[in-house]
Amino acid sequence: EDCEETKTETIPATGHKFSSWKTVKAQSIYSGAVQERICSACGKKETRIVGDKLKPVLKVNAPKLQLKRGQKTQKFTLTDMAKGDSVKSWVSSNKKIVTVSGKPNGTCIIKAGKKTGSAKITITMKSNLKKTIGVKVQKKAVACTSIKNVPKKLTLNKKKSYQLKPVIEPITCTQKIKYKTSNKKIAKINSKGKITAVKKGTAKITISVGKKKTVCKITIK
């Protein structure tokens, strides 16, 4: 008769074979970075927290605002906030002077009322960090106080172009930017600030906003 025999063999454990740690959730105001790794042999998952939670941050593109009566602007915005944070509320101290309607991402619409005067806008983050911005509403249009981000000197090769991107302060200024070249045969500039090099030589590009002016000297090779 055939004899059936069962043989049992013990295979020694080889241990876990974990993958390298992988970040599955970035560091935020609520927690450090969440990382995990998985064993390729048994599928076991391990999780760990790396680093501390982020410190709340609230930065804006203007420390204060000027507006003409009835003026509306969307130019005021948050320029930096910590990962995981967002704006919880936008509050005006006097809605007869100024109103604000904002979003969690840091953008907003600010509108001046019919009255002149001063008010404050308070921004509160989910992290409870707060910032207050002063707003002044006036009768006159908001005039330019400075023109920035324009190079003093510029060199271009013939037939090449360059786009000027002046930054006007305050951000609520409604005066138009005007561009003028001292020599159209050397360098042209259109109403949007695009310079086109025509032929070799030098010219001056004047950028003006209201009573403020700045000049860029351009050399064409």
What residue spans do the PLM features occupy?
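Short Cys/His-rich metal-coordination motifs, predominantly Zn2+-binding knuckles/fingers
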Residues: 1-7, 14, 39-46
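Short, recurring structural edge motifs at helix starts
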Residues: 23-27
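Extracytoplasmic soluble-region selector
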Residues: 18, 29-34, 40, 44, ...
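Linear, non-domain "peripheral" regions
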Residues: 7-11, 20-22, 46-50
